[in-house]
């Protein structure tokens, strides 16, 4: 069972690495998409480009997923550390850590606005659910 849980967390970490490679492209797509919508609705010359840059920065900060990714990485590491512990009663602790992992995955998904990142989130959720099922078998 431990090997299966390690594999599930490793799969979550693989998807997280994929998200890290997609993140810079997502920011560019968001910026270009906002600019295109603005130009289509207002015109190319009818807006202040400096103001647009400020608004784009604000928007990108609002949907930034870097904090969630850092916390997700930390939770995965903590999960593996607890899994290594040689104690009998680690099931509840692992269950709580999986809840935290789930929160970070869900927040990433809700902030992403990117289909490729959403695919990674779905795969991570699948691995998370399988991990929860394994833990429930122990409890």
Where are these regions (language model features)?
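N-terminal intrinsically disordered, cationic/polar leader segments
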Residues: 1-139
């Amino acid at each position: 069972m431990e090997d299966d849980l390690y594999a599930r967390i490793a799969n979550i970490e693989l998807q997280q690495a994929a998200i890290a490679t997609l993140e810079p492209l997502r920011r560019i797509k968001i910026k270009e998409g906002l600019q295109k919508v603005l130009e289509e609705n207002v015109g190319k010359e009818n807006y202040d480009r400096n103001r647009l840059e400020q608004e784009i920065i604000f928007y990108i900060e609002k949907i930034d997923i870097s904090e969630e990714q850092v916390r997700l990485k930390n939770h995965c590491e903590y999960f593996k550390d607890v899994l290594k512990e040689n104690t009998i009663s680690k099931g509840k602790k692992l269950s709580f850590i999986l809840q935290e992992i789930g929160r970070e995955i869900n927040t990433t998904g809700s902030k992403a606005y990117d289909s490729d990142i959403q695919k990674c989130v779905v795969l991570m959720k699948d691995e998370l659910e399988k991990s929860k099922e394994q833990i429930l078998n122990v409890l």
